[in-house]
């Protein structure tokens, strides 16, 4: 079976790393995978993103960077994300990864006009979430941990909103 590709575009705080591991560790633990089941790439360190067709799916983690910084690695990565979506490879974007994916697909990312959202928030799923392969079967409201200053303020053309909170209209979306 093909491995899962984890794209980690940033580092965690050192104080959290010693207690909970890195973002890639969180993804592996949450999905019940070992290191042999995954490959981790760090584009912010200059690592090239591989041919996504070699993997069964992609998870793009969070980062402390801001998507709107438009650093060269972010711009290259956005092209890679859009190509990967066009190739039909499933991608899950989490936090920064969600915003990066939204921007790569033609959406808009800005500082959240309602301010920074941090802590455990209630995310309300939309009716289309009931038929979503990832979210179907979950309760209509979920307590989720968040920490972000920026938001996908305009969904990519053709995207479907799957979840929102009081401060964030686009907590989750599906594209394609």
Residue ranges and their predicted role:
Residues 105-176:
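Pocket-forming structural segment of enzyme catalytic cores
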Residues 12, 46, 66, 99, ...:
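Surface-exposed, flexible loop/turn segments at secondary-structure boundaries
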Residues 16-17, 69-70, 102-104, 156, ...:
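Short glycine-/acidic-enriched loop or helix-start segments at secondary-structure transitions
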Residues 34, 80, 87-88, 141, ...:
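Structured helix-beta-strand junction loops
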Residues 25-29, 99, 132, 149-150:
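Active-site phosphate/pyrophosphate- and oxyanion-stabilizing loops and adjacent acidic/basic residues
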